[in-house]
Each structure stands twice: as C-alpha cells, then as structure tokens.
C-alpha cells in the first residue's frame, strides 16, 4: 500500500551504505527494486520507475552528484467516509491512492533548504535563519517555512538539504496534493536530521501546524494522517494529539468497486475563509448543546 516512505534506502537499512546518484540509479534498475515497484504500483510499475529515474537525473543536473542521495515517496489520499469530522474529535475512513509525490534528496551541509518542483516549475531556496511567514501567508514557500518551524517548535532538528520533486497527485481534486508534499518534506527532514525517530502522528501535527499558522487555514489532521500512514484506515480523533489508527484489509477491486477521481480544473485557493468557517460553525452547534465538539454530543 502507499504511505510516506523511503524507496531505495529501505533496501540498505542494515548496512546504510552511502550511494551517490549513479549508484542509486544502478540500484533503481535492479531486479529487487523492480519487484518492489511492482508491489507498490502494480501495472504502473514501469512508468513510475521512470519517474524516479527522471528525478535522479533532475537532481544531478540541478545540484551535481551527492555522496548519499535518497528517494522518497508520499501518496495522495481520499476520504471514503467522514469529512471535517476530525475537527469534531470524530472518526473517519480514509485511504491513500496510487498517485504520489516523489523526490530525490540529499543533505547539503549548509543553512539553506533548496527545493525544485518539476511539476509546478518552482525553484525555492529558504534560509533556516529566516522562517517567518510572508504577509500574504500563502504559497509553497510559506508552507515549507511552516514545516521547518513546526519541526523546531516541536523539538526536532532541521538542516540544509537539496531536493528535486515531481508529483502526479492531482491538484484541486480533493486528494490532498498539499498534504502529500508536506509528508514528503517531513520524511526528508526526519531521515536526514532526526535519525528516523519520528512517527506518522508527529508528521501530521507538523503539517497541520504549517497550514494553520503559515497559511491561516483551519486544517485538521485527516489529510496528513491518511497520506503518512497509507492503505485503507480508520482514524479516531477522540484524543487529537494521539489519534487511534487501525488498518483495514479490504480489496475494493475484488468487490467490483472503483474510485473515480475527477480533475475539476478549478482551484480552491480563494476558499480558505469558507473552509476555516466550517469547524467554527460546528463548534457553535456543539456549544448549543453545552459541549466543546460534536463528538461529545449524544445522538439522542
């Protein structure tokens, strides 16, 4: 199933041998990686393997070779049931999808984070000494700054790294292209500077912090949790700081069901105020019943 993960490094966790771009490309062409790609992408293994080759080439062209470059993947997500219920400390049924954000990255031993997005034609450099949001509080730069600040305020380490990223997670289609990107960056920061000690819940809270504080968007934890954990899952947000996640073993294809995603061609960048109003309106309803959130209100 899809979840935020390292792609090549999983094969060398025990030995942790450093590999440069050429060596990583060679590993990418191995039979072992072929089997993993087929497990992850099914019939789309060949075309998706080409995406990883492309980001490696893009990384080398942009940043030169590196003593240790790693490949990362983070999927988009879909809500099967439950929308905005995370704001109410309720339950959701969600799943990751086979569209993902992938990237090649390596530490650059500087005080700068340099990210190139092939998909959105962006070349971003952020100084770790300047993580204040812009006046506008919007866009990729603010989001990345929010993630970096979220790591710092949560007691985690950050540092300079280079990344070359591409994504086929459709924007404006309700599959969380932003959360997919957030979890990818969190995975890079965790791997490079925190010895991979962080868990998915920590990722999700940092992604939520970035959107809440640096985008002024009242996001919950659903999107980030679904992208980070992967597969078909239920999440109970009765304790938002420690949501309870359970995986569900169910094959929709075996039941003759397919999920159809439609790219509307219409963004929602101008709807942040309306989006943020939803949890506030729900809390007003809960307050009417003398409660803080709707999960505390009896159905009777």
Named regions from a protein language model:
Residues 1-18:
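Short, Lys/Arg-enriched N-terminal segments with co-localized hydrophobic residues
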Residues 14-77, 102, 106-137, 234-300:
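C-terminal nucleotide
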Residues 73-89, 168-185:
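Glycine/serine-rich anion-binding loops at beta->alpha junctions
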Residues 91-109, 229:
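Structural signature of FAD isoalloxazine-binding scaffolds in flavoprotein oxidoreductases
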Residues 96-98, 175-195:
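DPxDG-like acidic metal-binding loop motif
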Residues 135-169:
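Helix-rich "cap/lid" substructures immediately adjacent to catalytic or cofactor-binding pockets
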Residues 153-160, 189-203:
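Phosphate-handling active-site elements
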Residues 195-243, 248:
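Alpha/beta catalytic cores of group-transfer enzymes, especially the acyltransferase/condensing modules
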């Amino acid at each position: 199933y899809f979840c935020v993960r390292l792609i090549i490094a999983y094969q060398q966790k025990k030995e942790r041998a450093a590999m440069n771009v050429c060596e990583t490309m060679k590993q990418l062409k191995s039979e072992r990686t072929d089997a993993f790609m087929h497990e992850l992408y099914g019939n789309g293994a060949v075309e998706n393997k080409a995406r990883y080759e492309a980001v490696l080439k893009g990384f080398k062209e942009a940043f030169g070779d590196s003593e240790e470059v790693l490949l990362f993947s983070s999927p988009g997500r879909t809500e099967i049931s439950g929308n905005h219920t995370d704001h109410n400390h309720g339950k959701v049924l969600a799943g990751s999808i086979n569209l993902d954000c992938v990237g090649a990255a390596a530490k650059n031993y500087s005080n700068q984070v340099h990210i190139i997005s092939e998909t959105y034609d962006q070349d971003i450099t952020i100084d770790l000494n300047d993580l204040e949001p812009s006046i506008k509080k919007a866009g990729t730069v603010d989001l990345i700054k929010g993630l970096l600040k979220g790591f710092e305020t949560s007691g985690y380490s950050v540092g300079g790294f280079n990344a070359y990223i591409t994504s086929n997670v459709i924007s404006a289609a309700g599959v969380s292209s932003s959360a997919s990107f957030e979890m990818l960056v969190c995975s890079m920061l965790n791997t490079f500077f925190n010895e991979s000690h962080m868990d998915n819940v920590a990722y999700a809270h940092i992604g939520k912090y970035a959107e809440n504080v640096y985008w002024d968007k009242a996001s919950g934890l659903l999107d980030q949790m679904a992208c980070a954990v992967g597969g078909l899952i239920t999440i109970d947000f009765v304790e938002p700081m420690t949501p309870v996640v359970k995986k569900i073993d169910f094959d929709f294809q075996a039941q003759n069901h397919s999920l159809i995603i439609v790219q509307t061609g219409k963004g929602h960048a101008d709807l942040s105020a309306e989006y943020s109003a939803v949890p506030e309106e729900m809390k007003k309803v809960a307050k009417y019943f003398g409660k803080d959130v709707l999960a505390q209100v009896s159905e009777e």
